[in-house]
Amino acid sequence: MKNRLLEKRALDSRLTSPDVTAKEKWLGYLLGPSGALLLNAVLATYLNVYYTDVLNLTTVWDGAFLAVFPIVSKIIDAVTNIVMGYIIDRTRTKQGKARPWLLLSAPLVAVTGILLFTVPSGNRTVQVIWVMLSYNLFYSFAYTIYNMSHNLMVPLSTRNTEQRGSLSVFNQISTIMMSGIIVALIFPMLIMPQLGVDKSKWIVTMSILSCIALPLTLMEYYFTKERITLEGGEQKKDSVAMVTQLKAIFSDKYMIIIFIYFLIFTVGSTIKNISLVYFSNYVLGTYNDGKTQTMLSVIGGIPMGIGIFAVWPLAKKFGKRNLTAIGFIFYAVGSAICWLAPTNMVIVLIGQFIKNIGGLPCSYVFMALFADVLDHVEWKNGFRCDGIAMSIYNTIAVASVGICTGIFNLILSKSGYAAPYTNAAGQLIAVQSASVKSAITFTFVGLETITGIVLAILLLFLNVEKNIAKEQEEIKQRNGETTE
């Protein structure tokens, strides 16, 4: 992106310090991202409810529409992630290479977020076209631009690993606050009962959330700074061919390990999240009892609150890799405890608490560890691969949702899942066989017992931190920057 508009002082970052500042942490990485992250978290949970319960799209194409169009859209989304990574790596502006796209995404996310819900009434064909277009305008266009640039803020913020780790923690706090507290607890208790199936209320509520995202994303833009991009020499370097970047990425053992790590973790956690409702309804609790899922969510949120204060000091002392590996041992043990007694509320809650304690390091310091790997690849090859590497990261996340949903539904089908129904007496019958309950239990706690062990072992080979300080100094000297 080359534009005279970006040369204007009015668009300069409000940060001038070479070191990370307090206002950068609080405004750029905690408060700023919260608007777009809140909107995305709400959509991830409730957009499908709007499609099925408010618009009644389950009848379109005999039910095939809502099964096919999200999968096709995710394929489009995966492609646009790769394209966006390519574009970011070739962006040269005074404001950096990712921040300009963060600025552009602010109005785009707000407008397309509103379009998702302002579906015209009446003609069904028009509704279907509107849904397909608005869904892809948001996810494959606007939010892809935001998410790619947002995720690169930590890796591009500074080479100081301690400061970068601190930003990673603040960034993750914002994510957890939006999805783990507001969407998982406040929204279902206070907001959803008021919305019901009233389309106008849905439009007003979601439009407000979309509009809130605009000023907060602008705040994120103004209170972030790409110190690495703006280093001496970085902006003067010629663009590197995409094939060359891909070769650099996939010939580096640390990058391969971290992508495998992210893939395994994402598959396990995604299938677990999909199965949460089913586990609450059929194994641990009863159908829509209104308390089981909330209790599991609360237990999941408590360790995340504790982790705000504990994780980074421990990561500095023991190392990001080491702490994360130890965490995954607790992750596996906690899941195994739940697996042993999946119908006992007390035991499951204890197991979930232990499991979520173990998941703290991967939640809070992963992006800092990923940033170390990006620096290592730069040291090794002489050029950065931020955009294309992040596009692969995002593609894994995007593709996993569709694939994991398909895997979970296949497991349910093969185990003999029976949909709830109302009998002649007007009673809701929601009963599953032992094989179905066993399958649901495996997807909720069994799979993560296995992935926890695998990830703990895999991380033993990710010793990128060992020489990262030395490599960063060599990069600075190579770029003509004075060593601090």
Task: Enumerate the predicted regions with their spans.
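Membrane-embedded alpha-helical bundles of multi-pass transporters/translocases
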Residues: 2-484
